[in-house]
Amino acid sequence: MAMATQASLFTPPLSVPKSTTAPWKQSLVSFSTPKQLKSTVSVTRPIRAMAEEAPAATEEKPAPAGFTPPQLDPNTPSPIFGGSTGGLLRKAQVEEFYVITWESPKEQIFEMPTGGAAIMRQGPNLLKLARKEQCLALGTRLRSKYKINYQFYRVFPNGEVQYLHPKDGVYPEKVNPGREGVGQNFRSIGKNKSAIEVKFTGKQVYDI
């Protein structure tokens, strides 16, 4: 009995706290109908998708008077080469590949743009390449070292042949009186406008 009395001195009596919450009442504000916004009269304009005018097909400029683009002969023999030109890539089946032709006065060894060396035949030669840049590299080598003129073409998968270079029959390193200059500015680079002067104008310093 004494132990129970002693325990009761250190143990606080358990009492259920009284609920202080007020009874719930439905709020008229939370369920009130929302105020209707003032309707502004707006004119609905039908949206019409304006079809952009398709750019006109870029028509190739005709060759200058007196110049006839040479025709490609597919039966022209290829140089003697034991290696590989790297193939025509997959794009040749769906886009195009390039063919360079030249005529050599004798049989001689030359460097291939794809690596290695080959023997050009005496007379006409034809070489298929995957890139236009390879044709330009080989053509520059033919003219600088062997003094041989060249032509190259673009061949499409459907068999269509397009003559590319030299477009007007005169190589670009030569002066052609009838050729129009592209992007020419007859001034030194030091006389260009300052870059800050053309900022946000959509132009470049060499355009002004």
From Swiss-Prot:
<dbReference type="GO" id="GO:0009535">
    <property type="term" value="C:chloroplast thylakoid membrane"/>
</dbReference>
<feature type="region of interest" description="Disordered">
    <location>
        <begin position="52"/>
        <end position="78"/>
    </location>
</feature>
<keyword id="KW-0150">Chloroplast</keyword>
<dbReference type="GO" id="GO:0009538">
    <property type="term" value="C:photosystem I reaction center"/>
</dbReference>
<keyword id="KW-0809">Transit peptide</keyword>
<dbReference type="InterPro" id="IPR036579">
    <property type="entry name" value="PsaD_sf"/>
</dbReference>
<comment type="similarity">
    <text>Belongs to the PsaD family.</text>
</comment>
<keyword id="KW-0602">Photosynthesis</keyword>
<dbReference type="GO" id="GO:0015979">
    <property type="term" value="P:photosynthesis"/>
</dbReference>
<protein>
    <recommendedName>
        <fullName>Photosystem I reaction center subunit II, chloroplastic</fullName>
    </recommendedName>
</protein>
<keyword id="KW-0934">Plastid</keyword>
<dbReference type="InterPro" id="IPR003685">
    <property type="entry name" value="PsaD"/>
</dbReference>
<feature type="transit peptide" description="Chloroplast">
    <location>
        <begin position="1"/>
        <end position="50"/>
    </location>
</feature>
<keyword id="KW-0603">Photosystem I</keyword>
<dbReference type="Pfam" id="PF02531">
    <property type="entry name" value="PsaD"/>
</dbReference>
<comment type="function">
    <text>PsaD can form complexes with ferredoxin and ferredoxin-oxidoreductase in photosystem I (PS I) reaction center. PSAD may encode the ferredoxin-docking protein.</text>
</comment>
<keyword id="KW-0793">Thylakoid</keyword>
<keyword id="KW-0472">Membrane</keyword>
